[in-house]
């Protein structure tokens, strides 16, 4: 760590805890915020939640391939500035990754293009940038990392019924209790999708397939 010359951050909350320590261990390292130049969105909230409850901005920028392409450009440029002798290698790696991202982006668009119901319900609001990129709308259950109260839960259920939602998406890192309650109330089901899976390309293909099978 002490020999690090470049630190890339993406804006997830835990970075705020370790970046000061990183600055002590590697004082010469350049810190690059990959969100710079991106249009950030607020965190989506369930009905009845107070503005700002979820914190802002939404940190989940990596779930939109078009935004990841822009971040990849920045990483390439920073690496070339750091090691100009490896420019050819960095550019080749970048080109392959961008080609994979473009193929992924096109595949997701084709899978979701014909869906008439564009709303989907999630327990934790991780998928806002993904929704923006592909013309969808996420409807969250949770606000500010807190479980919904009875009033919010009822409003969420009514919103799901009015929007034609039949699936509640959850991620493995969170409790499924409230999601199962909502699914039972709307005659739907709970389906797991993981925004933190290590295989980025493969995972988003699986997520797109899950969305395509569960959106009407």
Task: Tell me what each language-model feature is.
Residues 1-216:
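Extracytoplasmic metal-acquisition and chelation regions
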């Amino acid at each position: 760590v002490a020999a690090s010359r470049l630190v890339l951050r993406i804006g997830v909350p835990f970075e705020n805890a370790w970046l000061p320590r990183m600055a002590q261990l590697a004082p010469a390292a350049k810190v690059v915020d990959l969100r710079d130049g991106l249009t950030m969105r607020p965190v989506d909230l369930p009905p009845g939640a107070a503005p700002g409850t979820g914190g802002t901005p939404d940190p989940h920028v990596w779930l939109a391939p078009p935004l990841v392409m822009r971040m990849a450009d920045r990483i390439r440029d920073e690496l070339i500035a750091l090691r100009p002798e490896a420019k050819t290698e960095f550019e080749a790696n970048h080109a392959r990754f961008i080609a994979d991202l473009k193929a992924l982006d096109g595949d997701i668009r084709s899978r979701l293009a014909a869906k008439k119901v564009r709303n989907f319900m999630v327990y934790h609001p991780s998928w806002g940038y993904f929704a923006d990129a592909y013309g969808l709308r996420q409807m969250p259950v949770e606000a500010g990392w807190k479980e919904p109260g009875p009033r919010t839960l009822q409003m969420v259920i009514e919103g799901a019924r009015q929007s034609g939602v039949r699936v509640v998406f959850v991620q493995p890192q969170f409790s499924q209790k409230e999601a199962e309650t909502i699914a039972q109330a709307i005659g739907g089901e709970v389906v797991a999708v993981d925004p933190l899976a290590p295989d980025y390309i493969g995972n988003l293909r699986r997520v797109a397939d899950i969305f395509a099978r569960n959106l009407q």
